[in-house]
Amino acid sequence: MNKRNKKVEKKELSRILIANRGEIALRAIQTIQEMGKESIAIYSIADKDAHYLNTASAKVCIGGAKSSESYLNIPAIISAAELFEADAIFPGYGFLSENQNFVEICSHHSLEFIGPSAKVMALMSDKSKAKSVMKEAGMPVIEGSEGLLKSYQEAEEIADKIGYPVIIKAAAGGGGRGMRVVEDKSKLKNLYLAAETEALSAFGDGSVYLEKFINKPKHIEVQILADKHGNVIHVGERDCSVQRRQQKLIEETPAVVLEEGVRERLLETAIKAAKYIGYVGAGTFEFLLDSNMKDFYFMEMNTRLQVEHTISEMVSGLNLIEWMIKIAQGEKLPKQESFSLKGHAIECRITAEDPKKFYPSPGKITEWIAPGGVNVRLDSHAHANYVVPTHYDSMIGKLIVWGENRERAIAKMKRALKEFKVEGIKTTIPFHLEMLENADFRQAKIHTKYLEENF
Protein backbone atom coordinates (compact mmCIF):
# COMPACT_ATOMS: atom_id res chain seq x y z
CA MET A 1 0.00 0.00 0.00
CA ASN A 2 2.90 2.35 0.78
CA LYS A 3 3.97 4.21 -2.39
CA ARG A 4 6.64 6.52 -0.99
CA ASN A 5 8.91 7.24 -3.98
CA LYS A 6 9.52 10.98 -4.19
CA LYS A 7 12.74 12.48 -2.94
CA VAL A 8 12.48 14.06 0.50
CA GLU A 9 13.57 17.68 0.69
CA LYS A 10 14.99 18.91 3.96
CA LYS A 11 13.69 22.27 5.12
CA GLU A 12 14.39 24.17 8.29
CA LEU A 13 11.27 25.28 10.17
CA SER A 14 11.89 28.57 11.95
CA ARG A 15 8.53 29.75 13.31
CA ILE A 16 5.90 27.32 14.60
CA LEU A 17 2.35 28.15 15.63
CA ILE A 18 0.89 25.93 18.36
CA ALA A 19 -2.77 25.18 17.64
CA ASN A 20 -3.58 24.16 21.19
CA ARG A 21 -3.71 25.31 24.79
CA GLY A 22 -2.69 24.34 28.32
CA GLU A 23 0.09 21.98 29.29
CA ILE A 24 0.73 20.61 25.79
CA ALA A 25 1.04 24.15 24.43
CA LEU A 26 3.58 24.99 27.13
CA ARG A 27 5.47 21.77 26.47
CA ALA A 28 5.62 22.58 22.74
CA ILE A 29 6.80 26.15 23.43
CA GLN A 30 9.65 24.81 25.57
CA THR A 31 10.83 22.31 22.97
CA ILE A 32 10.52 24.75 20.07
CA GLN A 33 12.61 27.33 21.92
CA GLU A 34 15.22 24.72 22.92
CA MET A 35 15.59 23.95 19.19
CA GLY A 36 16.35 27.62 18.51
CA LYS A 37 13.04 28.32 16.81
CA GLU A 38 10.26 30.84 17.43
CA SER A 39 6.93 29.80 18.95
CA ILE A 40 3.56 31.43 18.41
CA ALA A 41 0.90 30.75 21.05
CA ILE A 42 -2.79 31.18 20.32
CA TYR A 43 -5.38 31.67 23.04
CA SER A 44 -9.05 32.22 23.66
CA ILE A 45 -10.56 34.97 25.80
CA ALA A 46 -10.96 32.41 28.60
CA ASP A 47 -7.19 31.74 28.59
CA LYS A 48 -6.02 35.36 28.28
CA ASP A 49 -4.39 35.42 31.74
CA ALA A 50 -2.58 32.06 31.47
CA HIS A 51 1.06 32.54 32.47
CA TYR A 52 2.48 30.11 29.91
CA LEU A 53 1.47 32.45 27.07
CA ASN A 54 4.21 34.85 28.15
CA THR A 55 6.89 32.21 27.53
CA ALA A 56 6.13 32.08 23.78
CA SER A 57 7.92 34.25 21.23
CA ALA A 58 4.54 35.75 20.34
CA LYS A 59 0.91 35.28 21.37
CA VAL A 60 -2.38 36.10 19.70
CA CYS A 61 -6.03 35.92 20.76
CA ILE A 62 -8.07 34.05 18.17
CA GLY A 63 -11.60 34.16 19.58
CA GLY A 64 -14.12 33.52 22.30
CA ALA A 65 -14.14 31.07 25.17
CA LYS A 66 -16.04 28.36 23.30
CA SER A 67 -13.77 25.93 21.46
CA SER A 68 -15.77 26.50 18.28
CA GLU A 69 -14.88 30.19 18.45
CA SER A 70 -11.17 29.66 19.11
CA TYR A 71 -9.27 26.37 19.22
CA LEU A 72 -11.54 24.82 16.57
CA ASN A 73 -11.75 28.03 14.53
CA ILE A 74 -9.72 27.09 11.45
CA PRO A 75 -9.94 30.48 9.65
CA ALA A 76 -8.77 32.31 12.78
CA ILE A 77 -5.86 29.91 13.31
CA ILE A 78 -4.73 30.12 9.68
CA SER A 79 -5.01 33.93 9.78
CA ALA A 80 -2.86 34.02 12.92
CA ALA A 81 -0.26 31.78 11.26
CA GLU A 82 -0.12 34.04 8.21
CA LEU A 83 -0.08 37.22 10.28
CA PHE A 84 2.96 36.03 12.23
CA GLU A 85 4.55 34.41 9.15
CA ALA A 86 4.65 30.92 10.65
CA ASP A 87 5.95 28.13 8.44
CA ALA A 88 4.48 25.24 10.44
CA ILE A 89 1.66 24.30 12.80
CA PHE A 90 2.01 21.97 15.77
CA PRO A 91 -1.43 20.52 16.63
CA GLY A 92 -0.88 18.82 20.00
CA TYR A 93 -3.80 16.53 20.87
CA GLY A 94 -7.55 17.06 20.89
CA PHE A 95 -9.09 20.03 19.05
CA LEU A 96 -7.89 19.93 15.39
CA SER A 97 -5.09 17.39 15.82
CA GLU A 98 -6.92 14.67 13.85
CA ASN A 99 -8.93 16.88 11.50
CA GLN A 100 -7.93 15.99 7.93
CA ASN A 101 -9.69 19.08 6.56
CA PHE A 102 -7.42 21.24 8.73
CA VAL A 103 -4.35 19.39 7.42
CA GLU A 104 -5.41 20.05 3.82
CA ILE A 105 -6.07 23.73 4.53
CA CYS A 106 -2.61 24.05 6.11
CA SER A 107 -1.12 22.59 2.93
CA HIS A 108 -3.06 25.03 0.74
CA HIS A 109 -1.57 27.89 2.76
CA SER A 110 1.99 26.49 2.52
CA LEU A 111 2.01 25.63 6.22
CA GLU A 112 3.76 22.42 7.28
CA PHE A 113 1.39 20.39 9.46
CA ILE A 114 3.54 18.60 12.03
CA GLY A 115 1.90 15.21 11.73
CA PRO A 116 0.70 12.68 9.15
CA SER A 117 -0.87 13.40 5.78
CA ALA A 118 -4.57 14.14 5.43
CA LYS A 119 -4.96 10.94 3.41
CA VAL A 120 -3.54 8.66 6.10
CA MET A 121 -5.38 10.57 8.82
CA ALA A 122 -8.68 10.13 6.97
CA LEU A 123 -8.01 6.43 6.51
CA MET A 124 -7.31 5.77 10.18
CA SER A 125 -10.07 8.06 11.49
CA ASP A 126 -12.71 5.80 9.95
CA LYS A 127 -12.55 2.99 12.50
CA SER A 128 -14.20 0.48 10.18
CA LYS A 129 -11.87 1.19 7.23
CA ALA A 130 -8.88 1.26 9.55
CA LYS A 131 -9.75 -2.21 10.81
CA SER A 132 -9.90 -3.57 7.24
CA VAL A 133 -6.57 -1.98 6.29
CA MET A 134 -4.87 -3.23 9.46
CA LYS A 135 -6.12 -6.72 8.67
CA GLU A 136 -4.44 -6.39 5.26
CA ALA A 137 -1.26 -5.28 7.04
CA GLY A 138 -1.23 -8.49 9.08
CA MET A 139 -2.62 -7.16 12.34
CA PRO A 140 -4.93 -9.38 14.39
CA VAL A 141 -8.42 -7.85 14.42
CA ILE A 142 -11.54 -8.70 16.38
CA GLU A 143 -14.24 -10.69 14.60
CA GLY A 144 -17.18 -8.57 13.48
CA SER A 145 -18.81 -6.71 10.60
CA GLU A 146 -16.91 -6.17 7.36
CA GLY A 147 -17.27 -2.43 7.10
CA LEU A 148 -20.18 -0.31 8.27
CA LEU A 149 -23.55 -1.71 9.24
CA LYS A 150 -26.33 -0.92 6.81
CA SER A 151 -29.19 -1.77 9.16
CA TYR A 152 -30.20 -3.19 12.51
CA GLN A 153 -31.11 -6.42 10.72
CA GLU A 154 -27.53 -6.80 9.47
CA ALA A 155 -26.25 -6.21 12.99
CA GLU A 156 -28.57 -8.94 14.25
CA GLU A 157 -27.36 -11.43 11.62
CA ILE A 158 -23.69 -10.82 12.43
CA ALA A 159 -24.26 -10.94 16.20
CA ASP A 160 -26.09 -14.26 15.85
CA LYS A 161 -23.16 -15.61 13.85
CA ILE A 162 -20.27 -14.55 16.11
CA GLY A 163 -22.17 -14.81 19.40
CA TYR A 164 -22.87 -12.40 22.25
CA PRO A 165 -21.69 -10.20 23.88
CA VAL A 166 -20.95 -7.77 21.04
CA ILE A 167 -20.00 -4.11 20.97
CA ILE A 168 -21.39 -1.47 18.61
CA LYS A 169 -18.94 1.34 17.81
CA ALA A 170 -19.14 4.66 16.00
CA ALA A 171 -17.03 4.68 12.82
CA ALA A 172 -15.90 8.23 13.55
CA GLY A 173 -15.75 7.58 17.28
CA GLY A 174 -13.45 8.21 20.16
CA GLY A 175 -13.54 8.72 23.92
CA GLY A 176 -16.21 6.06 24.41
CA ARG A 177 -18.94 8.00 22.59
CA GLY A 178 -21.17 6.14 20.15
CA MET A 179 -20.25 2.87 21.82
CA ARG A 180 -22.60 0.27 23.34
CA VAL A 181 -22.00 -3.22 24.75
CA VAL A 182 -24.85 -5.64 23.96
CA GLU A 183 -25.09 -8.60 26.32
CA ASP A 184 -27.91 -10.45 24.56
CA LYS A 185 -30.20 -10.31 21.54
CA SER A 186 -33.12 -8.71 23.39
CA LYS A 187 -31.11 -5.51 23.92
CA LEU A 188 -29.57 -5.23 20.46
CA LYS A 189 -32.14 -3.02 18.73
CA ASN A 190 -32.37 -0.34 21.43
CA LEU A 191 -28.60 -0.18 21.92
CA TYR A 192 -27.96 -0.14 18.16
CA LEU A 193 -30.24 2.89 17.80
CA ALA A 194 -28.70 4.56 20.86
CA ALA A 195 -25.17 4.15 19.45
CA GLU A 196 -26.26 5.57 16.07
CA THR A 197 -27.95 8.57 17.70
CA GLU A 198 -25.01 9.35 19.98
CA ALA A 199 -22.51 8.98 17.12
CA LEU A 200 -24.50 11.39 14.96
CA SER A 201 -24.73 13.90 17.79
CA ALA A 202 -21.06 13.67 18.81
CA PHE A 203 -19.37 13.36 15.41
CA GLY A 204 -21.96 14.39 12.82
CA ASP A 205 -21.77 10.83 11.47
CA GLY A 206 -24.13 8.09 12.64
CA SER A 207 -22.25 5.23 10.95
CA VAL A 208 -21.53 2.27 13.24
CA TYR A 209 -19.93 -1.16 13.04
CA LEU A 210 -20.03 -4.25 15.23
CA GLU A 211 -17.40 -6.43 16.89
CA LYS A 212 -17.17 -9.35 19.26
CA PHE A 213 -16.85 -7.93 22.79
CA ILE A 214 -13.64 -8.93 24.60
CA ASN A 215 -14.43 -9.27 28.29
CA LYS A 216 -12.10 -7.63 30.83
CA PRO A 217 -9.24 -6.83 28.43
CA LYS A 218 -6.18 -4.75 29.08
CA HIS A 219 -5.57 -1.63 26.98
CA ILE A 220 -2.07 -1.84 25.54
CA GLU A 221 -0.70 0.62 23.00
CA VAL A 222 2.50 1.03 20.99
CA GLN A 223 4.20 4.38 20.40
CA ILE A 224 5.80 4.70 16.97
CA LEU A 225 7.75 7.37 15.11
CA ALA A 226 7.94 7.35 11.31
CA ASP A 227 9.97 9.66 9.07
CA LYS A 228 9.52 10.75 5.45
CA HIS A 229 12.20 8.30 4.30
CA GLY A 230 10.19 5.19 5.17
CA ASN A 231 11.92 4.51 8.49
CA VAL A 232 9.79 3.48 11.47
CA ILE A 233 10.86 2.87 15.07
CA HIS A 234 8.91 2.02 18.20
CA VAL A 235 9.30 3.66 21.61
CA GLY A 236 7.91 0.69 23.51
CA GLU A 237 4.43 -0.13 24.68
CA ARG A 238 2.20 1.43 27.35
CA ASP A 239 -0.41 -0.10 29.64
CA CYS A 240 -3.40 2.26 29.82
CA SER A 241 -5.88 -0.11 31.48
CA VAL A 242 -6.70 2.21 34.40
CA GLN A 243 -9.55 4.10 32.80
CA ARG A 244 -13.07 5.25 33.53
CA ARG A 245 -15.63 5.23 30.73
CA GLN A 246 -12.87 4.92 28.13
CA GLN A 247 -10.98 7.89 29.62
CA LYS A 248 -7.44 7.03 30.69
CA LEU A 249 -6.40 7.99 34.22
CA ILE A 250 -3.08 6.23 34.87
CA GLU A 251 -0.60 4.99 32.26
CA GLU A 252 2.66 3.11 32.63
CA THR A 253 5.47 1.61 30.59
CA PRO A 254 6.52 -1.10 30.10
CA ALA A 255 3.42 -3.32 30.33
CA VAL A 256 4.70 -5.80 32.90
CA VAL A 257 2.02 -8.41 32.05
CA LEU A 258 3.52 -9.06 28.61
CA GLU A 259 5.77 -12.05 28.08
CA GLU A 260 8.81 -11.10 26.00
CA GLY A 261 7.64 -13.09 22.98
CA VAL A 262 4.24 -11.36 23.02
CA ARG A 263 5.91 -7.97 23.41
CA GLU A 264 8.20 -8.55 20.43
CA ARG A 265 5.28 -9.65 18.27
CA LEU A 266 3.25 -6.59 19.34
CA LEU A 267 6.02 -4.11 18.55
CA GLU A 268 6.90 -5.75 15.23
CA THR A 269 3.22 -5.72 14.21
CA ALA A 270 2.96 -1.97 14.89
CA ILE A 271 6.09 -1.14 12.89
CA LYS A 272 4.95 -3.28 9.96
CA ALA A 273 1.49 -1.63 9.95
CA ALA A 274 2.94 1.90 10.06
CA LYS A 275 5.13 1.11 7.05
CA TYR A 276 2.20 -0.46 5.22
CA ILE A 277 0.11 2.73 5.34
CA GLY A 278 3.06 5.08 4.71
CA TYR A 279 2.69 6.78 8.07
CA VAL A 280 4.72 9.90 8.92
CA GLY A 281 5.06 11.45 12.37
CA ALA A 282 4.24 10.27 15.88
CA GLY A 283 1.41 7.76 16.14
CA THR A 284 -0.04 5.20 18.49
CA PHE A 285 -1.55 1.81 17.76
CA GLU A 286 -4.06 0.80 20.43
CA PHE A 287 -4.79 -2.85 21.18
CA LEU A 288 -7.03 -4.91 23.40
CA LEU A 289 -5.08 -7.63 25.21
CA ASP A 290 -7.16 -10.70 26.03
CA SER A 291 -7.31 -11.87 29.64
CA ASN A 292 -4.97 -14.73 28.66
CA MET A 293 -2.28 -12.02 28.24
CA LYS A 294 -1.20 -13.55 24.93
CA ASP A 295 -3.73 -12.57 22.26
CA PHE A 296 -3.98 -8.92 21.22
CA TYR A 297 -6.31 -7.25 18.75
CA PHE A 298 -6.08 -3.94 16.89
CA MET A 299 -8.52 -1.38 18.26
CA GLU A 300 -7.58 1.92 16.61
CA MET A 301 -4.73 4.18 15.64
CA ASN A 302 -4.31 7.67 17.03
CA THR A 303 -2.69 9.79 14.33
CA ARG A 304 -1.34 12.36 16.77
CA LEU A 305 0.68 12.72 19.92
CA GLN A 306 -0.92 11.06 22.94
CA VAL A 307 -1.37 12.68 26.35
CA GLU A 308 0.70 9.83 27.81
CA HIS A 309 3.66 10.21 25.43
CA THR A 310 5.59 11.47 28.45
CA ILE A 311 6.22 8.03 29.94
CA SER A 312 7.69 6.81 26.65
CA GLU A 313 10.06 9.79 26.82
CA MET A 314 11.06 8.92 30.37
CA VAL A 315 12.17 5.36 29.53
CA SER A 316 13.76 6.20 26.17
CA GLY A 317 15.38 9.58 26.71
CA LEU A 318 13.80 10.81 23.46
CA ASN A 319 11.92 14.09 23.17
CA LEU A 320 8.97 13.05 21.01
CA ILE A 321 7.88 16.60 20.19
CA GLU A 322 11.40 17.43 19.06
CA TRP A 323 11.37 14.36 16.83
CA MET A 324 7.98 15.30 15.39
CA ILE A 325 9.48 18.63 14.33
CA LYS A 326 12.64 16.99 12.98
CA ILE A 327 10.53 14.55 10.96
CA ALA A 328 8.52 17.47 9.53
CA GLN A 329 11.83 19.03 8.47
CA GLY A 330 12.72 15.88 6.53
CA GLU A 331 15.30 14.52 8.96
CA LYS A 332 15.90 10.80 9.40
CA LEU A 333 15.05 8.91 12.57
CA PRO A 334 17.74 7.27 14.70
CA LYS A 335 18.17 3.51 14.35
CA GLN A 336 16.10 1.36 16.70
CA GLU A 337 19.26 -0.06 18.24
CA SER A 338 20.72 3.41 18.93
CA PHE A 339 18.64 3.82 22.08
CA SER A 340 17.26 1.46 24.71
CA LEU A 341 14.22 1.49 26.96
CA LYS A 342 15.22 1.54 30.61
CA GLY A 343 13.35 1.33 33.91
CA HIS A 344 9.65 1.95 34.53
CA ALA A 345 7.60 5.14 34.16
CA ILE A 346 4.11 6.02 35.41
CA GLU A 347 1.84 8.97 34.61
CA CYS A 348 -1.13 10.13 36.69
CA ARG A 349 -3.52 12.56 35.00
CA ILE A 350 -4.47 15.20 37.55
CA THR A 351 -7.89 16.63 36.77
CA ALA A 352 -10.06 19.31 38.37
CA GLU A 353 -12.71 16.80 39.42
CA ASP A 354 -14.20 15.32 42.55
CA PRO A 355 -12.02 12.26 43.32
CA LYS A 356 -15.03 10.07 44.17
CA LYS A 357 -17.73 10.99 41.65
CA PHE A 358 -15.53 12.68 39.03
CA TYR A 359 -17.81 15.72 38.87
CA PRO A 360 -16.08 18.80 37.37
CA SER A 361 -14.56 21.22 39.87
CA PRO A 362 -13.64 24.40 38.00
CA GLY A 363 -12.62 27.54 39.86
CA LYS A 364 -9.64 29.40 41.26
CA ILE A 365 -6.59 27.53 42.54
CA THR A 366 -5.65 29.27 45.78
CA GLU A 367 -2.52 27.24 46.52
CA TRP A 368 -0.27 25.19 44.25
CA ILE A 369 2.80 23.38 45.57
CA ALA A 370 4.36 21.11 42.97
CA PRO A 371 6.29 17.97 43.94
CA GLY A 372 9.98 17.60 43.18
CA GLY A 373 12.84 15.14 43.39
CA VAL A 374 14.96 13.05 41.08
CA ASN A 375 13.08 11.71 38.05
CA VAL A 376 9.82 13.45 39.00
CA ARG A 377 8.24 15.50 36.22
CA LEU A 378 5.13 17.68 36.24
CA ASP A 379 3.71 18.84 32.91
CA SER A 380 1.24 21.58 33.80
CA HIS A 381 0.14 25.07 32.86
CA ALA A 382 -1.59 25.65 36.22
CA HIS A 383 -0.33 27.73 39.14
CA ALA A 384 -1.55 29.55 42.24
CA ASN A 385 -4.39 31.97 41.33
CA TYR A 386 -4.97 30.17 38.03
CA VAL A 387 -8.68 29.89 37.26
CA VAL A 388 -9.65 26.50 35.81
CA PRO A 389 -12.16 27.34 33.05
CA THR A 390 -15.40 25.48 32.43
CA HIS A 391 -15.03 25.40 28.65
CA TYR A 392 -12.28 22.81 28.19
CA ASP A 393 -10.94 19.47 29.38
CA SER A 394 -10.57 19.26 33.16
CA MET A 395 -6.93 18.11 33.15
CA ILE A 396 -4.69 20.54 35.01
CA GLY A 397 -1.50 18.52 34.91
CA LYS A 398 0.30 15.25 34.35
CA LEU A 399 2.53 13.89 37.10
CA ILE A 400 5.18 11.57 35.71
CA VAL A 401 7.85 9.56 37.51
CA TRP A 402 10.62 7.15 36.56
CA GLY A 403 12.08 4.35 38.65
CA GLU A 404 14.53 1.50 38.13
CA ASN A 405 11.58 -0.90 38.28
CA ARG A 406 7.80 -0.81 38.76
CA GLU A 407 7.97 -1.07 42.54
CA ARG A 408 10.32 1.91 42.80
CA ALA A 409 8.23 3.91 40.34
CA ILE A 410 5.06 3.29 42.38
CA ALA A 411 6.84 4.33 45.58
CA LYS A 412 8.12 7.51 43.91
CA MET A 413 4.67 8.36 42.54
CA LYS A 414 3.08 7.91 45.99
CA ARG A 415 5.63 10.24 47.53
CA ALA A 416 5.18 12.84 44.78
CA LEU A 417 1.37 12.75 45.02
CA LYS A 418 1.56 13.30 48.78
CA GLU A 419 3.81 16.33 48.20
CA PHE A 420 1.50 17.77 45.53
CA LYS A 421 -0.75 20.36 47.15
CA VAL A 422 -3.64 21.99 45.29
CA GLU A 423 -6.20 24.08 47.17
CA GLY A 424 -9.31 25.98 46.05
CA ILE A 425 -10.64 23.21 43.80
CA LYS A 426 -11.09 19.48 44.09
CA THR A 427 -8.63 17.24 42.23
CA THR A 428 -8.15 13.55 41.54
CA ILE A 429 -4.95 13.33 43.62
CA PRO A 430 -6.74 11.31 46.37
CA PHE A 431 -8.05 8.87 43.74
CA HIS A 432 -4.54 8.24 42.43
CA LEU A 433 -3.20 7.63 45.93
CA GLU A 434 -6.00 5.13 46.52
CA MET A 435 -5.26 3.34 43.24
CA LEU A 436 -1.56 3.04 44.02
CA GLU A 437 -2.46 1.23 47.25
CA ASN A 438 -4.91 -1.06 45.45
CA ALA A 439 -3.77 -4.71 45.57
CA ASP A 440 -4.98 -5.45 42.04
CA PHE A 441 -3.13 -2.44 40.66
CA ARG A 442 0.07 -3.45 42.42
CA GLN A 443 -0.27 -6.92 40.91
CA ALA A 444 -1.02 -5.44 37.43
CA LYS A 445 -4.46 -7.08 37.36
CA ILE A 446 -6.43 -3.98 36.33
CA HIS A 447 -8.58 -4.29 33.20
CA THR A 448 -10.49 -1.59 31.31
CA LYS A 449 -13.77 -2.14 33.18
CA TYR A 450 -12.21 -2.48 36.62
CA LEU A 451 -13.12 0.97 37.91
CA GLU A 452 -16.75 0.72 36.84
CA GLU A 453 -17.02 -2.64 38.60
CA ASN A 454 -15.12 -1.78 41.79
CA PHE A 455 -15.31 1.98 42.44
PLM regions and their residue ranges:
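ATP-binding N-terminal substructure of ATP-dependent carboxylate-amine bond-forming enzymes
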Residues: M1-E136, L149-E157, R408
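Conserved beta3 strand of the protein kinase N-lobe
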Residues: G144-S145
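A short acidic, helix-capping loop that chelates divalent metal ions and anchors anionic groups
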Residues: G176-G178
